[in-house]
């Protein structure tokens, strides 16, 4: 089979033959429904279809490292670009971080090359080798070690495949007369024997049931490399050739390809899917690190955690921040800060009036207590309110706990509001590109050249970089303990924030012919100042990382 046709790859070069010879042999082959075991058949369909996403199939932890990397030219990473969908700038120190952006087609080629390298040693059918590699998370060394430890039967049993060196029961069953009808054990309809197919385990079902079974497993359950034989209690895995032979829908084939290649990518610590929706590119690095990489689609992200590039905050703290924003922890803080528990039945109570004489509404409790000290109401007297229990230890502890919750809530809201404000402003600044483009056209109509008006685009680029940096500085500051270095950081942050707001104001003004030169000078001066202050802030934070100057609040 020609390896350039579709995505069928032949591993045994000694068995290659011409198209005419192979075509003649296929006509004479009595088992023409069984594909050549030396071929890894992943279908002859387009590998990348923009309209079909894989959703959550890319979630998971990376593990191991495969050796099937190619020799493509590498390009410089990150840098200081930023705007569009990047979410953050690259740090100037990261210019040496080299990476390449691969298509899903190239990833498939890397995967096939990995299988080829292993097969040169163990000499198994390609589809069996692929299942073995998947079992070991595409770690070739671990597979080789287990393969030659002398217990092959145990290895194949763990991987849920039949030892290919044994005679196939399925091929023995294929010798039965094709004229004899037999019932399918799934749909119980009678078909000729030629309409049945099965795996090496010997279980056979009609092709219609096979197709529906595989389609359900792939499209609805998201299973690719772990589809087992449909026979009850049989755990033998379905190989790639069988899947591609029995499925006719190109979308199902495409989804299956994504599932298989996704396993390869997620088990390789040097590969990472681009997190942009409907993007099927993969970034390949020389070594894994928390550095910015940019996909061909324009998305810039952190290779380590997959989030938008988030300098100056580290991945660990950003992960905690995102979780804090997503879960109900701050709802609990609000309840703790604005409500109290009944001292008797512990039901949560919110005060809705000025009187501190509280009566629990729980019909089984109805305790009366003081809102201030949480003590019984009776000792307070009935003539007028006069709480005389401020100094008791239990009341003091209750008030202290409430104050701590209230302070924690206020602190969180302070940083969260500023974080969200810069995030919202960043979205608005992206829309500013269209407005700036119109302004640039207007300025060219006032006798300014195309080169002369490029300062506006540069200013918007810098503005977006500064917004993204400021957004993540509030995450960094939330977990930062107060010390002399944190004061310097906050001063740098305030200076950059003020300059960024001024630059944003300049860009949103209407530009008239009278103020053209004046506003150009102001914009250029301000975006250069913003660039400088942003650089100073990031250099200070990274210097703190290198010298271990930062102390953190464990949340």
UniProtKB/Swiss-Prot annotation:
Acidic residues: compositionally biased ranges: 1-47
Entry GO terms, CC: Cajal body; cytoplasm; Lewy body; nuclear body; nucleus; ubiquitin ligase complex
Region described as TRIAD supradomain: spans on this chain: 180-391
Residue numbers of N6-acetyllysine PTMs: 140
Key words, A-Z: Acetylation, Cytoplasm, Metal-binding, Nucleus, Repeat, Transferase, Ubl conjugation pathway, Zinc, Zinc-finger
Residue sites binding Zn(2+) 4 per the record: 302, 305, 310, 315
Annotated positions binding Zn(2+) 2: 201, 203, 229, 234
GO molecular function list: ubiquitin conjugating enzyme binding; ubiquitin protein ligase activity; ubiquitin-protein transferase activity; zinc ion binding
Residues given in the record as Zn(2+) 3 binding sites: 274, 279, 295, 297
EC code: 2.3.2.31
Record: residues binding Zn(2+) 6: 370, 373, 380, 387
Ranges of Gly residues composition bias in the record: 65-90
PANTHER family, per the entry: RBR FAMILY RING FINGER AND IBR DOMAIN-CONTAINING
Domain remark in the UniProt entry: Members of the RBR family are atypical E3 ligases. They interact with the E2 conjugating enzyme UBE2L3 and function like HECT-type E3 enzymes: they bind E2s via the first RING-type zinc finger, but require an obligate trans-thiolation step during the ubiquitin transfer, requiring a conserved active site Cys residue in the second RING-type zinc finger. The active site probably forms a thioester intermediate with ubiquitin taken from the active-site cysteine of the E2 before ultimately transferring it to a Lys residue on the substrate.
Protein name: E3 ubiquitin-protein ligase ARIH1
